[in-house]
Swiss-Prot record:
Protein name: Acyl-[acyl-carrier-protein]--UDP-N-acetylglucosamine O-acyltransferase
Organism: Chlorobaculum tepidum (strain ATCC 49652 / DSM 12025 / NBRC 103806 / TLS) (Chlorobium tepidum)
Keyword Protein transport tagged: no
Location of this chain's protein in the cell: Cytoplasm
TM region(s), chain numbering: none
């Protein structure tokens, strides 16, 4: 059974799952799909193109699937996809995509805290925690189990690898490879492995050692990046974690530069 407040405005074409709750003065446009048992608070605006999964929680003042903030956008049909069990807190804004990819994607089991903005064509993975007032430019890619500290600004097209942690108030204008900590405003730098986060997620001492060995070569050997990656490829066991690190450095799309070592 759905519970929809009398003051909510629901488009005639909107598809609402079983057990959906919608608070007062919320506006849901026509081309919207909302999964079962999702709870939407008061004064929320969900625009055409939103595809929201099951058991999400969307708080007061959130604005989802509005048009991308991109001068090239010409009104083409695009989407915002949100997975299951994602929590979206107060006044979050998530724009839909542009013709570049057609959609902005937010995965499942995420916590997106108040006043976060994610621009057009962003891809945010699963089990991600984004603290208050983080701002993502368009085309950012955020891997699974990433944590981003409050008030960080993430430049358009930046990639953040899985299990990485970005410190609060950072100016993240460089790609952040998996498993590391990064931070800084005037100088955004590598700050070591995300050891506590990795241990909490069940990484073994052997896995941590393999990751540490790879990043010692990449960030502390003094080698050019291309030579450091070659050394990692040739001199270390090619475990899944090491391969993931190498793949990240090999797969940049927008030619963003990579994170620098803390002593550079």
């Amino acid at each position: 059974m759905r519970n929809i407040h009398a003051t909510a405005v629901i488009g005639s074409g909107a598809v609402l799952g079983e057990g959906v709750e919608i608070g007062p003065y919320t506006v849901i446009e026509d081309d919207v799909v909302i999964g079962d048992r999702t709870v939407i608070g008061p004064h929320v605006h969900i625009a055409d193109g939103a595809r929201i999964g099951n058991e999400c929680r969307i708080s007061t003042g959130a604005v989802l699937a509005t048009a991308p903030q991109d001068l090239k956008y010409a009104g083409e049909k695009t989407y915002l996809h949100i997975g299951d069990r994602t929590v979206i807190r107060e006044c979050v804004t998530l724009n839909r995509g542009t013709k570049a990819s057609g959609k902005t994607v937010v995965g499942s089991d995420n916590l997106i805290m108040a006043y976060v903005h994610a621009g057009h064509d962003c891809v945010i993975g699963n089990h991600v925690v984004i603290a208050n007032s983080v701002q993502f430019g368009g085309h950012c890619h955020v891997g699974d189990y990433v944590v981003v500290g409050g008030l960080a600004g993430v430049h358009q097209x930046v990639r953040i690898g899985r299990y990485a942690m970005v410190g609060g108030i950072s100016r993240a204008a460089l790609d952040v490879p998996p498993f590391v900590m990064a931070g800084g405003h005037a100088s955004f730098r590598y700050e070591g492995l995300n050891v506590i986060g990795l241990k909490r997620r069940g990484f073994t001492s052997e896995q941590l050692g393999n990751i540490r060995d790879a990043y010692r070569i990449i960030f502390q050997s003094g080698l050019l990046l291309s030579k450091a990656l070659e050394a990692v490829r040739n001199d270390l066991p090619q475990t899944p974690e090491v391969v993931e690190i190498l793949d990240f450095f090999a797969s940049g799309v927008y030619n963003r530069k990579f994170l620098k070592p803390f002593n550079s």
